């Protein structure tokens, strides 16, 4: 695993690109890699398959979402309007 305890996955960049950007990348990737809630079964078992494609490990539901998170702010607003 590349990186260190302090910077996580952004350690692969070394001293390049600046601290602020590397911290931002590490934060986004940490959120992306955690388990998310499935919109079908409600379990915390959703993982990213590819860019914008998410799949529940429990029920097998596959759906499109954001590039780094399964639910985007725009998607939340649309869902709120339609319900």
Curated annotation (Swiss-Prot):
Q: Which cofactor does it need?
A: Zn(2+)
A Gene Ontology term for the protein's cellular component? ribosome
Q: Where are the zinc fingers (C4-type)?
A: 38-59
What SUPFAM superfamilies does the database record attribute to this sequence? Zn-binding ribosomal proteins (SSF57829)
Which Pfam family, an example, fits this chain?
Answer: Ribosomal_L37ae
Summarize where Zn(2+) binds, as residue positions. 38, 41, 56, 59
Which UniProt keywords are present, listed alphabetically?
Metal-binding, Ribonucleoprotein, Ribosomal protein, RNA-binding, rRNA-binding, Zinc, Zinc-finger
Any GO BP: translation
GO terms of molecular function: large ribosomal subunit rRNA binding; structural constituent of ribosome; zinc ion binding
Q: How is the cofactor bound?
A: Binds 1 zinc ion per subunit.
Supply the PANTHER family for this chain: 60S RIBOSOMAL PROTEIN L37A, LARGE RIBOSOMAL SUBUNIT PROTEIN EL43
Q: Share what the entry says about its subunit structure, partners included.
A: Part of the 50S ribosomal subunit.
The family classification in the record reads: Belongs to the eukaryotic ribosomal protein eL43 family. Putative zinc-binding subfamily.
Q: Which HAMAP family match?
A: Ribosomal_eL43
**Function field:** Binds to the 23S rRNA.
Q: Under what name is this protein listed?
A: Large ribosomal subunit protein eL43
Q: Which organism is it from?
A: Pyrococcus furiosus (strain ATCC 43587 / DSM 3638 / JCM 8422 / Vc1)
Q: What is the lineage of its organism?
A: Archaea, Methanobacteriati, Methanobacteriota, Thermococci, Thermococcales
């Amino acid at each position: 695993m590349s990186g260190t305890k302090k910077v996580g996955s952004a350690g692969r960049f070394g001293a390049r690109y600046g601290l602020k950007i590397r911290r931002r990348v590490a934060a986004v990737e940490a959120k992306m890699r955690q388990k998310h809630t499935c919109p079908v079964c409600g379990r915390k078992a959703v993982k990213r398959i590819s860019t914008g494609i998410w799949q529940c490990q429990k029920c097998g539901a596959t759906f499109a979402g954001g590039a780094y998170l399964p639910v985007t702010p725009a998607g939340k607003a649309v869902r709120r309007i339609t319900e």
